[in-house]
C-alpha cells in the first residue's frame, strides 16, 4: 500500500490526497481513497497529469462508466467528455447543481482531470448537501421528506439545439445516500433546472425552492478550488452540488470528465 496523506480542505467538505499515483493503484490504497471520498464528499489529487486511458481505468474502479443523453463524447473514448471553454453565453454550469438530474438514475460520481487551465479564474466550487439537510430545523426536515421535485435538462437541451419538451425526471428533495445512509438535500437551480415540486404549480413551488437553494449554499459548507494543470478532482454526485465559475473570458480551460452510473434516488 502506498503511504498517502489526506488533508481536509475545509472543516465542512473536501480533502487533498497526496502520495499516490492514480494510474497505478493497489487494492489497499484504493480502499483508503474510497474511505476518504465517502467521508469528505470530494477529493483533490494534485499533480496527476492523467492520460485518458489512466483516467478511464481509475474511473472503472468505482463502477460502470455513465453515458448521458444529449452529450457528445470523445472519439475512441466512450464516456470521456472533453470540457472546453464554450464562452460565458453558452456556459450551462454557472449555477449550483447536481449532474444529470434530468435522468432517472443520476450519476453517482464525477472525475475531472485538468489538462490546460487559465492563468487565473475558472475555479469550481462544491457544497456539502448533507450539512444543508442536517442544519434545517426538525420541522422543515419533516416537511421536505415527503416532497418530490421536477428536474429538467432545459439548459443542456438548449445548448444542444434540441427543441420541444426537454427531458425531465422526478426525484425526492431529500435523498438517502446508498453507501453512507446519510440524508442530503437534493435540489437544483430554481426555475430552469427545478421548476416545481411534484403535483404543484411553479408559482406555488418557487418561494420554497428559492429558500432551500439559498439555504443550501451557505459559505460555511463550501470549498472553492483553484485549478492547476494536472489536478484530478472527484466528487460524490449524491451529496454535493457544484458550481463552475466562468470568469476567465476566452482563456483556454480544458478538462476531461468521466462519470459513474448511479442509482435511482430514494
Predicted segments, located by residue:
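Non-heme Fe(II) oxygenase catalytic core, chiefly the N-lobe of the double-stranded beta-helix
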Residues: 2-232, 237-266
Amino acid at each position: 500500500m502506498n503511504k498517502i496523506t489526506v488533508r481536509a480542505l475545509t472543516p465542512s467538505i473536501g480533502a487533498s490526497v497526496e502520495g499516490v499515483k492514480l494510474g497505478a493503484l493497489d487494492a489497499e490504497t484504493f480502499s483508503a481513497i474510497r474511505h476518504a471520498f465517502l467521508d469528505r464528499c470530494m477529493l483533490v489529487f494534485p499533480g496527476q497529469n492523467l492520460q485518458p486511458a489512466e483516467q478511464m481505468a481509475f474511473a472503472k474502479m468505482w463502477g460502470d462508466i455513465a453515458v448521458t443523453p444529449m452529450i457528445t463524447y470523445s472519439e475512441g473514448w466512450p464516456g470521456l467528455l472533453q470540457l472546453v471553454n464554450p464562452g460565458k453565453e453558452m456556459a450551462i454550469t454557472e449555477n449550483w447543481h447536481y449532474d444529470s438530474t434530468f435522468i432517472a438514475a443520476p450519476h453517482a460520481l464525477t472525475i475531472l482531470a485538468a489538462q490546460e487551465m487559465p492563468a487565473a479564474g475558472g475555479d469550481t466550487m462544491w457544497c456539502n448537501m448533507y450539512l444543508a439537510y442536517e442544519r434545517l430545523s426538525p420541522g422543515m426536515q419533516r416537511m421536505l421528506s415527503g416532497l418530490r421535485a421536477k428536474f429538467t435538462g432545459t439548459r443542456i437541451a438548449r445548448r444542444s439545439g434540441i427543441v420541444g419538451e426537454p427531458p425531465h425526471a422526478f426525484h425526492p428533495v431529500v435523498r438517502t445516500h446508498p453507501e453512507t445512509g446519510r440524508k442530503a438535500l437534493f435540489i437544483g437551480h430554481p426555475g430552469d433546472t427545478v421548476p416545481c415540486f411534484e403535483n404543484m404549480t411553479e408559482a406555488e413551488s418557487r418561494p420554497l425552492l428559492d429558500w432551500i437553494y439559498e439555504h443550501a449554499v451557505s459559505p460555511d459548507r463550501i470549498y472553492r478550488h483553484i485549478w492547476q494543470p494536472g489536478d484530478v478532482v472527484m466528487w460524490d454526485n449524491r451529496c454535493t452540488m457544484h458550481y463552475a465559475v466562468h470568469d476567465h473570458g476566452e482563456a483556454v480551460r480544458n478538462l476531461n470528465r468521466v462519470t459513474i452510473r448511479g442509482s435511482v434516488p430514494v
